[in-house]
């Protein structure tokens, strides 16, 4: 009986401990997500390989210009973490509506290739033809309302045969 009571006391002590913090926030502006923002904490998951670099770009202003070349507000390049998801802090000028794009440059060449992955805020479904012809998703599907520090999940997509999408969970 005393072992049962001791075990229950031990379990209650473990339950009272604070939840362990997640992965360290990466990027040159990591401190901006430790306060009140405004910032996006971009949570990137679904890596094909643990090599290369991530390029995160934020967009604001006119939603029809999201993802246009050269229209980004902030660009951050970081190494792919050895394990787990990547949390990147992206500060924004003020609370409001924004979008994010992420590119996983698998070989670190600085150029987009067929092995590279990508994703966007809102995780819109894109076809391989959308990627080939550089068609942008509807702004309503990718827009994020930032107030303070706002978490933005992004699942990476890769070319797989004749399609473009997230890797199967079993292959991670």
Predicted regions and their residues:
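Bacterial N-terminal signal peptides
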Residues: 8-20
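Beta-strand signatures of extracellular beta-sandwich domains
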Residues: 55-59, 101
